[in-house]
Amino acid sequence: VAQPAYLLHRGDALDAYGSWPAPVAVISDGAYGVRGFHGDTTGVAPLADWYRPHVEAWSRHAGPATTLWFWNTELGWATVHPLLAESGWDYVQVITWDKGAGHIAGNVNGKTIRRFPVATEVCALYQRRLELPGADGLMPVQQWLRHEWQRSGLPLARANEACGVRNAATRKYLTQDWLWYWPPGEMVERLASYANERGAESGWPYYSLDGQAPVTGKAWDTLRHKWRHVHGLTNVWRLAPLHGAERIKGTMKRAAPRVYRPSSLSAAHLNQKPLQFMHRILNAVTDPGDVVWEPFGGLASASVAAIEAGRFPCVAELDHDFAEIAAQRLADALAG
């Protein structure tokens, strides 16, 4: 039986997570606290509770190298950040989408406004916090690397000999301060071989993830989230909100509680994301064939980009009308 090119769940993502394959990346574009869709909150105070069951599910199903992209307003992201941190997601950086002055043109009353007009939103990148098992239980990866060497009873300086370096092992790979550097798989494999050949007898092999055998360099490298660098690209992305052919309009439906009289020129979704941005974040942290979750699909822009990029998207959308549009966009993307 041929495998589908994507999975679309017409309903709550909470009912779909258990049947989806584990994600390499999660792209979240849910509640902002701005009444931006039916089901969005009024204000940011309820956001943590709104996201909590989803964050718990992401945490259960994520792999050690899963990344999370979290779209929101500045304040919405700041409100949910503590929940993400306590749930085992480590902050990497924030991308700022600068929509330009055209985004607020004609919508600012200079006599009543008491702040600078907002023409941005953000997308925060998180990586799954890595804790590794050992003879003495789970430990953060930085602590685990040094602890395994110390457990062998070998002098710390011998780690440099094991890695064939002057001092990089003790100065970078095994240090416990801010100078710590993620060691390449080749170096971890060398540490493991040296410690197991020359260290004290132990019931749990040194640098083992399962208590049976030391970790290999190849296995070690899969524990770190992927990253594909693009020179010249910073964390500020300047692009006007969609207005051209990519923007979906004319559904004559109220896209959100604050939309009262939609016309044939009204956007189907108030905050449709550019495919250009979705391709950018997918390219940064995933490879062809990787599973991408889009739990709050809307118009499924992330999943459309995922299909175009050869990834395997799993998308959910609760709103019937949005789900219909998403289904058509996904089919069109697959057809090329």
What are these regions (language model features)?
Residues 2-316, 320-323:
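Core catalytic lobe of class I
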Residues 326-327:
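Conserved SAM-binding loop
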Residues 322, 331-336:
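Conserved phosphoryl-transfer catalytic core
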